[in-house]
Amino acid sequence: MEKQENVGHIVQIFGPVIDVQFPNEHMPAILSALEVKINDESIIFEVAQHLGEGIVRAIAMSMTYNLSKGLEVYDTGSQISVPVGKQVLSRMFNVLGQPIDGGKPLDSFIKNPIHANAPTYLEQKATSEILVTGIKVIDLLIPFIKGGKIGLFGGAGVGKTVLVQELINNIASKHGGLSVFAGVGERSREGNDLYFEMKKAGVLDKTALVFGQMNEPPGARMRVALSALTMAEYFRDYENQDVLLFIDNIFRFTQAGSEVSTLLGRIPSTVGYQPTLSTEMGQLQERITSTIRGSITSVQAVYVPADDITDPAPATTFSHLDAKTVLDRGIAALGIYPAVDPLASSSRALEPNIVGKKHYLVAKKVVQILQRFKELQDIIAILGVDELSESDKQVVARARRIRNFLSQPFFVAQKFSGIQGQFIKIQDTVNNFDELLSGKYDNIPEEAFLYVGTIDQALEKAKKMGWSEKN
């Protein structure tokens, strides 16, 4: 390439960061890709700072083993670019858009730079169409909007990744559009499992996967979400598609940015995070939107450090989301999955003019009963249920049935649980909870409502437990 005639030399190396001396009049632009060739391999860096006197500081996108001072560095003259278009479907890539699935190299393809401007106000399009997930607790209480941004918040081990995988299974297989999955700083094993699950489910041919896992340097983890988003944007803007973008885990994007910020010598902000946290998050999130050409619906898993929802990383993500789904360790400890906390979760789509009046009223009533149940917990812990008034006893009994009925067997978990996964239509969910609220099933054992899809299945389970309608 002609642009590679601009050659510099490494003058300093510290971990995944290098300083490179270029001629003063030929310093590479910020965000330019630099290339170091060593032992028949190529290491790509991205320019992050100009230090002056012709020296630039750059972040590595892969491991920096075998680097040494004095090595030649080539300015590619362009930003990091990744392949886009139909050739990326059914394939797995790294942050640089290189296939990592052992498949054949891509033929001729289009490449787009990973950095781009967000759509303008005139290009954006608002929508209020509900995205059906088939998961009762989500469809009833936290409905997702097509073209919206959805966050799944939770600490370690409460079921975020399993919920993301179930959403991929339910939505990707039902909606028929294209999907892009970004594995950001998570376990390689989970990526491997997801790849084969999607292959088995027959949705891989409509999906592109991009991974920058937790064993990779911070530069790769910070940019991999942008690589995946670039692929999704092409489908939206040039092929007029409705795209699903799954990101697991958006916290690792922030965490990688924090590591890079420290390596670049920036003074840390609150709780040690980078001072540019809001800017970096905004630049990513504002590109994820619906336009007049197509839509991107994003589902993002958000790790909550030490279960502290006020931590700057999850708190910064909140403001960009249309629906907030909070997973709770206490609910998981009860053995209720998905461990969604209905009282901490919210969605701007839960409005009567969007979901319908009946759906809205049923959802509000469910939340009211669960809220009252929570208020009574301290009294129950001290005095016991017997000391409650008759009306409160009824609330407690009904709330326990509702809480159990919000659980659901997942398709992606059936090989572990042995229970067949369930996809429940919204209308069935609303009608079932409406009947449950009416007291029609107050005499059915509350255990019968655990891990069933519908009321009819709960009745069958109750009969197997020895319950009869005469009871």
From Swiss-Prot:
It holds the Pfam family ATP-synt_ab_N. ATP binds at residues 154-161. Its EC number is 7.1.2.2. The keyword Cell membrane applies. Transmembrane segments: none annotated. Keywords: ATP synthesis, ATP-binding, Cell membrane, CF(1), Hydrogen ion transport, Ion transport, Membrane, Nucleotide-binding, Translocase, Transport. Disulfide bonds: none annotated. GO terms for molecular function: ATP binding; ATP hydrolysis activity; proton-transporting ATP synthase activity, rotational mechanism. It catalyses: ATP + H2O + 4 H(+)(in) = ADP + phosphate + 5 H(+)(out). The keyword Acetylation does not apply. One of its GO terms (cellular component) is plasma membrane. Its main location: membrane. It is a peripheral membrane protein. InterPro entries: AAA+_ATPase, ATP-synt_VA_C, ATP_synth_F1_bsu, ATPase_a/bsu_AS, ATPase_alpha/beta_chains, ATPase_F1/V1/A1_a/bsu_N, ATPase_F1/V1/A1_a/bsu_N_sf, ATPase_F1/V1/A1_a/bsu_nucl-bd. It is found in: Cell membrane. F-type ATPases have 2 components, CF(1) - the catalytic core - and CF(0) - the membrane proton channel. CF(1) has five subunits: alpha(3), beta(3), gamma(1), delta(1), epsilon(1). CF(0) has three main subunits: a(1), b(2) and c(9-12). The alpha and beta chains form an alternating ring which encloses part of the gamma chain. CF(1) is attached to CF(0) by a central stalk formed by the gamma and epsilon chains, while a peripheral stalk is formed by the delta and b chains. Belongs to the ATPase alpha/beta chains family. Produces ATP from ADP in the presence of a proton gradient across the membrane. The catalytic sites are hosted primarily by the beta subunits. This is ATP synthase subunit beta. It comes from Mesomycoplasma hyopneumoniae (strain 232) (Mycoplasma hyopneumoniae). The lineage of its organism: Bacteria, Bacillati, Mycoplasmatota, Mycoplasmoidales, Metamycoplasmataceae. The gene is atpD.
